[in-house]
């Protein structure tokens, strides 16, 4: 991950990067055992991570070109598709491992997984890449990680 000065300095990209970064920070805080309150919500973080991570993973595995074109203003080549498919299958496997309760502490794993993805995914994309920041493009990723962070620290 580059620590260079952000390439994208417009308010939309900086604001959305902040949204997903706050979500990532909340997820890391929850990983350490930190909480900021208790909400009785109908979904927990592990379920949320399985659904959102599993759907993104399936999308990147089965239709990488579609997802890349939906989210970024860059030409897609066979290398992009390869890396997207490779990432997608790992997301699907993580979802399976969470679902199968194959971790000692699925909550901590979900926090760590989603926290890392928040920073390496939408936050980095908003700061350094050419994401399509639209409601049908990249904006939902920022919101998903923020919601994941809120779920994590209020469980």
Which sequence ranges carry the predicted segments?
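Membrane-water interface at the C-terminal end of transmembrane alpha helices
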Residues: 25-33, 125-126, 146-155
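Interfacial loop at the N-terminal end of multi-pass membrane proteins
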Residues: 65-84
């Amino acid at each position: 991950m580059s620590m260079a000065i952000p390439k994208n300095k417009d308010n939309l990209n900086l604001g959305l990067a902040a949204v997903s970064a706050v979500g990532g920070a909340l997820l890391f805080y929850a990983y350490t055992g930190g909480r900021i309150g208790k909400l009785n919500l109908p979904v927990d973080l592990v379920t949320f991570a399985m659904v959102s991570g599993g759907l993104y993973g399936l999308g990147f595995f089965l239709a990488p070109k579609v997802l890349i074109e939906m989210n970024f203003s860059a030409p897609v080549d066979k290398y992009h598709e390869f890396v997207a498919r490779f990432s997608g299958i790992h997301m699907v496997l993580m979802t399976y491992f969470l679902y199968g309760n194959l971790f000692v502490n699925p909550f901590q794993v979900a926090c760590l997984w989603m926290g890392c993805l928040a920073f390496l995914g939408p936050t980095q994309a908003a700061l350094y890449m050419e994401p399509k920041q639209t409601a049908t493009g990249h904006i939902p990723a920022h919101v998903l990680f923020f919601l994941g962070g809120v779920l994590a620290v209020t469980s």
